Regions:
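RNase H-like polynucleotidyl transferase catalytic core
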Residues: 23-37, 112-142, 155-156
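Conserved Walker B catalytic segment
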Residues: 105-113
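Extended, low-complexity cationic-aromatic segments
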Residues: 1-77
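A short acidic (Asp/Glu
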Residues: 12-15, 102-106, 140
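Short, basic/hydrophobic alpha-helical segments
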Residues: 71-91
């Protein structure tokens, strides 16, 4: 069973925190901004799969934003990793994001499962959508929140690469190549 979700990791926004400080000297987080000519993105999109049985988070950052084509690439990557450790089924628990319920993703899961059944090998996917407006039911959500608190920089601005590396370090997983869709050739 795996809980899937996407998360934006901002280089600028600060998470809500609670902390102790000396009386009369409150702890402060510095809000930053970037110049208009900064080539790095203000935020990074990341797909994650939380596997409670393995006590692991699998992450892949995305060049761009979450879309159906990237979603299928992420799920395929997860299936490859699960097959390598001897699993047969992925019960995929995720929300009703448009890129999860799209025709492209539903068709891909159907084709994938038919190919697994025909070949007799691979990972079968059972898609379980959470009720709408119920993100707290996804076990990965608290992990994102705690991760954001672990990677933030109190008084500096992280670069996109450093932010991605800190996120992967916080979740004790490798920083893999970012997922992207191939450029359309005209």
């Amino acid at each position: 069973m795996g809980f899937e979700d996407e998360c934006w990791w901002s280089r600028l926004a600060r998470p809500s925190l609670h902390g102790w400080s000396e009386e009369g000297n409150p702890m402060r987080l510095v809000q930053h901004s970037v110049s208009k000519d900064d080539p790095e993105p203000k935020a990074l999109s990341c797909y994650g799969l939380f596997l409670p049985e393995l006590e692991q988070m699998w992450l892949r950052f995305v060049n761009g934003r979450p879309v159906s084509g990237i979603t299928t690439r992420f799920v395929q990557w997860c299936c490859t990793k699960l097959e390598a450790i001897g699993k047969k089924v992925l019960v995929l628990i995720w929300d009703n994001a448009s890129w999860h319920v799209s025709k492209e993703v539903r068709s891909w899961i159907g084709r994938h499962n038919r190919a697994v059944k025909k070949s007799g090998s691979g990972i079968r996917i059972i898609s379980c959508l959470l009720p709408k407006q119920s993100p707290w039911l996804n076990a990965i959500e608290p992990k994102w929140m705690h991760g954001k608190r672990r990677v933030m920089e109190a008084d500096g601005l992280l670069g996109a690469q450093e932010l991605a590396e800190r996120v992967c370090e916080a979740f004790e997983c490798p920083h893999y190549e970012h997922l992207s869709l191939p450029e359309k050739v005209a």
